[in-house]
């Protein structure tokens, strides 16, 4: 059974690995495994991540029954990616560790750049940026250009958050050097990195704000709301640095509300704090139960 890579936006826009299709298959196909993988991928597209997690776990169990090293790697990678997008980075790391062990048992001992990529994202979420940067650097050496692009992007995020201006500048140069027709997601990543680099190097805050908003607009179109919210947060930083406190508060409020609805509570709380009193009431929130007087 041959597996192939399929790319989809998910949280940090990581790539999902898919099963079957697109190539001639010269041996019998395990339809149960294929259906589990396809059902999980469809669930991701509908943002039903709990269902996707369940189906990728089922796919992995089927892959173990089949003793299929490629399918085990794909299912483990996908399961960890979904767990990361669910806000469960510790679970993602546990899945990655177990997947690497299962692969090694079957003779695959070489480093897997895809697993390194997800590991970098999980470690970054946990604030373990030194380890995250090392994992992202390993992933950036992959042969797969999609993994390289996303690894470079994560390197830039880590560098900005940890004050590593040299690495952030090198990542900005990587994106600036890309040529030809690029995927929209790459353009958005490059714009966000450019905005971040401008803000730490004393560049134009207006350009930084424009770059961040271009990234946000692309991600809105791609239904990539978590990454869109983060770009809005960068626009807030640019407005704050420009001295426009009102615009900054509004950007932070928008980022906070979007992130909260997308399930990213930690980021939502952080941006809400930066927005201060500018956080508008959510018109779609459930009404707060009113206290009713107790009868005596």
Name these PLM-found stretches.
Residues 206, 250, 254-296:
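Terminal, low-structured helical/coil segments at or just beyond the last alpha-helical repeat
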Residues 25-27, 65-68, 105-108, 141-144, ...:
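Short coil/turn linkers that connect adjacent helices within long alpha-helical scaffolds
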Residues 52, 92, 132, 167-171, ...:
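Single-residue signature of alpha-solenoid repeat helices
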Residues 34-35, 73-74, 114, 150-153, ...:
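Residue register of alpha-helical TPR repeats
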Residues 46, 66, 86, 126, ...:
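Structural motif corresponding to the intra-repeat A-B loop/turn of tetratricopeptide repeats
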Residues 2, 7-10, 14-78:
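N-terminal leader/linker segments that initiate helical-solenoid repeat arrays
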């Amino acid at each position: 059974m041959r597996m192939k890579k399929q790319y989809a936006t998910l949280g940090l826009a990581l790539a999902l690995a898919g099963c079957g299709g697109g190539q001639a298959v010269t041996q019998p196909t395990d339809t149960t495994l294929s259906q589990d993988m396809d059902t999980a991928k469809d669930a991701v597209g509908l943002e039903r991540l709990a269902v996707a997690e369940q189906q990728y776990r089922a796919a992995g169990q089927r892959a173990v029954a089949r003793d299929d090293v490629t399918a085990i790697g794909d299912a483990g990678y996908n399961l960890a990616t979904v767990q990361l997008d669910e806000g469960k980075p510790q679970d993602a790391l546990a899945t990655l560790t177990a997947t690497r062990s299962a692969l090694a048992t079957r003779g695959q001992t070489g480093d897997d750049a895809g697993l390194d990529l997800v590991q970098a994202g999980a470690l970054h979420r946990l604030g373990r940026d030194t380890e995250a940067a090392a994992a992202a650097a390993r992933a950036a050496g992959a042969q797969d250009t999609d993994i390289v692009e996303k690894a470079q992007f994560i390197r830039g995020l880590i560098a900005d958050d940890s004050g590593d201006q040299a690495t952030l500048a090198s990542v900005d140069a990587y994106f600036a050097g890309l040529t030809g027709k690029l995927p929209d997601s790459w353009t958005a990543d490059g714009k966000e990195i450019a905005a971040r680099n401008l803000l730490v190097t004393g560049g134009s805050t207006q350009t930084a704000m424009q770059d961040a908003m271009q990234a946000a607009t692309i991600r809105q179109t791609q239904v990539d709301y978590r990454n869109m919210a983060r770009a809005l947060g960068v626009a807030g930083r640019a407005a704050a640095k420009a001295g426009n406190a009102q615009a900054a508060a509004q950007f932070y409020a928008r980022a906070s509300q979007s992130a909260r609805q997308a399930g990213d509570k930690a980021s939502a709380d952080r941006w809400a704090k930066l927005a201060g009193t500018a956080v508008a009431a959510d018109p779609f929130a459930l009404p707060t139960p009113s206290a009713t007087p107790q009868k005596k």
